[in-house]
Structure formats: structure tokens, C-alpha cells
Amino acid sequence: MSVLDVLWEDRDVRFDVSSQQMKTRPGEVLIDCLDSIEDTKGNNGDRGRLLVTNLRIIWHSLALPRVNLSIGYNCILNITTRTANSKLRGQTEALYILTKCNTTRFEFIFTNLVPGSPRLFTSVIAVHRAYETSKMYRDFKLRSAVIQNKQLRLLPQEHVYDKINGVWNLSSDQGNLGTFFITNVRIVWHANMNDSFNVSIPYLQIRSIKIRDSKFGLALVIESSQQSGGYVLGFKIDPVEKLQESVKEINSLHKVYSASPIFGVNYEMEEKPQPLEALTVEQIQDDVEIDSDDHTDAFVAYFADGNKQQDREPVFSEELGLAIEKLKDGFTLQGLWEVMS
């Protein structure tokens, strides 16, 4: 099983997660912690805390920690600043985050309740940019710019453990002769005749590493995760002793990586935040039974509403007997009540 098969933190948007899911996973690092942040779209008027890690953004209510959000960076489509109406700050500059999870778009608005502080914007935008520019650590890549002058272009924090010449890539009928690099982050192979014919396989994406028989004899076979396309790649390493030694080394490095992954998202704050465990409040179980099979409508408030710039005008609803924001064309109150049915 690849590390990616159990990694959800940067690849999902979740609502009201358990205290266990709010804790950092191996390799996840808390970069910044901002108090007095309002979730203006879903919990307007509720003071909360925003935690920025190298994989996601976590927001939780200070009054009710079980009211929370976990937003993975891989789901973020766009981050902008706009004016929003906060119950605690009035009209103020806010951070807008548009996300897409599976086929559903969610929009989040966060307001810093500390006047004149740009830290909310700088932290989230900078860390997300660091995530976007470090995909070589995490993504399976074919024909990328990983080789320069026959040498591997090392990533920060990357170290080469072995370089093996004369390794055949068995992707074609006759095979391609090339060079094989084993590092603490990934495996890279490139053709000797053409540097651009290459493959970079992060340990994060590796599902299995085995020795199998092929028409070329015994070969190293690497299977990648389903998320990367489920590739099966074969490499011929001679002699057999070197093949066995290499497989043992790769399995060992993969095991070390799985225990403490290097995600490559590097951003240093001047002030170091406390550990995440010290910042999240333990959720107290109410004296009631919770049916986990029931659907939760916690996410309904966050559905992305097109390019809405401001609230629509209030209108009187005879059905409810109070003033409500005018519904979008094609929407009805009855339909909104049935959104989860």
C-alpha cells in the first residue's frame, strides 16, 4: 500500500472532523496559528482559530471545537481577497478560498478579527504557493525536467543514495538503456540517449516494489498508486546480486519515508507556533448517541455561489414569516430544505 492510499489531509475537504483527524499526521508540520479568525461564510459571528500546516488549513470554533473545517491544498482552485460582511468586524477585507472536492465546489471566507493584520493573507497564500511549487516531491512525473548534464537535479532535502548505470527500462519491446537514481524521496530513471525520456517516482506514489520474472529475465517491478494512474514499470538491473541489493535498499528507504514522509512544503515563520496538539481543544462527548450513518448538512453553507460579489437584497418570505436573502433564479425554499434528500 502506498502512503498516498491513506493520505487524505491535502486531498480532501472535510467538515466537523473528529479530534483525531485534526491532529497532524506523520510528515505534517504546523506552520502558523492565527487566533481570532472568523469563518464568515459558515459561522459568521463565531470567533475561531486558523491552523496552517504544510498540507491543509484547519479552522475550528473556539467555543465549540467540534465545529471545524479541514481544507486540503490540493483541492484549492483559487485564493483571493475581497470585501465581506462580518458580524464581528462589519465590512472588512477577507480571504476567499474556492475549492473543488470530487465534483463539488465549496467557497470559504475567512476574516481576521484583529484590525490591520495582513498575516491571514500572507501565511495562507505563501504556504499554498509553496505547496504548488513542490509537486515533484509528491507527483508521478513522465518526461519532466529532472536531468541536467546527465545529473539528477536534486530537490531541497533530497539526497542520492545510489546511482546505477546500465539499467534497462522495459517499457518497450527492445528496452531502453539508461541510468537509475535512488534517493530518500524518489526513484528516477532516464535514457542515456535522451535525457528527456525519463520517469520520476516519489515514494509517496509507490504501491509495491518486487522482483519478477520477465522475458528479459529477473527485473525490478514498481507499481504506482491508483491516483497516479496505476503504472507498472519494469527495470532490468545486472547482475542479479545488484538487483537484489537495489530492491532491498529501495524497500528500506520506502519504509523510512512512509514512517516520516517529506512533502517538500517549506515555509518558515519568524515566530514558531505551538504544536498542533496543544492548540486544538479536546472535544467533549455529549451524553447522547450519535448515529454516524446520518448525513450531515454542515457543508451546505459552503457551496460555491458562482461569482457572487455581495449579498443579495433581503425580501420578505410569507412561507417563513421573516426577511431572507433573495434566492437565486431557479431555487425554491422547498428545494433548499430537500437539498440532502
Curated annotation (Swiss-Prot):
Its main location: membrane. CDD domains: PH-like. One of its GO terms (biological process) is cilium assembly. The keyword Transport applies. Keywords: Cell membrane, Cell projection, Cilium, Cilium biogenesis/degradation, Cytoplasm, Cytoskeleton, Membrane, Protein transport, Transport. GO terms for cellular component: axoneme; BBSome; centriolar satellite; ciliary basal body; ciliary membrane; cilium. It is found in: Cell projection, Cilium membrane; Cytoplasm; Cytoplasm, Cytoskeleton, Cilium basal body; Cytoplasm, Cytoskeleton, Microtubule organizing center, Centrosome, Centriolar satellite. One of its GO terms (molecular function) is phosphatidylinositol-3-phosphate binding. It comes from the Eukaryota. The BBSome complex is thought to function as a coat complex required for sorting of specific membrane proteins to the primary cilia. The BBSome complex is required for ciliogenesis but is dispensable for centriolar satellite function. This ciliogenic function is mediated in part by the Rab8 GDP/GTP exchange factor, which localizes to the basal body and contacts the BBSome. Rab8(GTP) enters the primary cilium and promotes extension of the ciliary membrane. PPart of BBSome complex, that contains BBS1, BBS2, BBS4, BBS5, BBS7, BBS8/TTC8, BBS9 and BBIP10. Binds to phosphoinositides. Interacts with CCDC28B. Interacts with SMO; the interaction is indicative for the association of SMO with the BBsome complex to facilitate ciliary localization of SMO. Interacts with PKD1. Interacts with DLEC1. PANTHER family: BARDET-BIEDL SYNDROME 5 PROTEIN (PTHR21351:SF0), BARDET-BIEDL SYNDROME PROTEIN 5 (PTHR21351). Belongs to the BBS5 family. This is BBSome complex member BBS5. It comes from Mus musculus. The lineage of its organism: Eukaryota, Metazoa, Chordata, Craniata, Vertebrata. The gene is Bbs5.
